[in-house]
């Protein structure tokens, strides 16, 4: 193992639950405002997961007051306090970009049994 691999292995988190595109997550994000920090929960559907190792990222989409909001997080960042899997989604794609064009109940994802 070379030096970069050792540094990457030291930065990996082991408290990340298994999740896939289509799952609904609660991501507890540390928000720092001035000298204070607080935890903010971002709840949405995983529409993408890409990369590997330290550089792995995932994108979550939610609709807030009628406006679609997408946020991309690195999986192994220290800014994420914890990730909770709320529901498992039953989808057949790895990238759920088609959800951007759907409105209302059409954008709903079936729950895995």
UniProtKB/Swiss-Prot annotation:
Keyword Ribosomal protein recorded: yes
PROSITE patterns: RIBOSOMAL_L19
A biological-process GO annotation: translation
GO molecular function, one term: structural constituent of ribosome
InterPro entries hit by this protein: Ribosomal_bL19, Ribosomal_bL19_CS, Ribosomal_bL19_sf, Translation_prot_SH3-like_sf
Gene Ontology CC entries for this record: cytosolic large ribosomal subunit
Keywords: Ribonucleoprotein, Ribosomal protein
Record Pfam families: Ribosomal_L19
Keyword Ribonucleoprotein: yes
Family: Belongs to the bacterial ribosomal protein bL19 family.
Role according to the record: This protein is located at the 30S-50S ribosomal subunit interface and may play a role in the structure and function of the aminoacyl-tRNA binding site.
Protein name (Swiss-Prot/TrEMBL): Large ribosomal subunit protein bL19
Species in which this protein is naturally found: Corynebacterium diphtheriae (strain ATCC 700971 / NCTC 13129 / Biotype gravis)
């Amino acid at each position: 193992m070379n030096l970069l691999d050792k540094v990457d292995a030291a930065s990996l988190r082991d408290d990340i639950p298994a999740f896939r595109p289509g799952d609904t997550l609660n991501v507890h994000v540390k928000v720092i405002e001035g000298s204070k920090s607080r935890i903010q929960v971002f709840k949405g559907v995983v529409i993408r997961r890409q990369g590997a190792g330290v550089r792995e990222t995932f994108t979550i989409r939610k609709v807030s007051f009628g406006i679609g909001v997408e946020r991309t997080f690195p999986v192994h960042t220290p800014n994420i306090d914890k990730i909770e899997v709320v529901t498992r989604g039953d989808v057949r794609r790895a990238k759920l970009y088609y959800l951007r064009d759907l409105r209302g109940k059409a954008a709903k994802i079936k729950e895995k049994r």
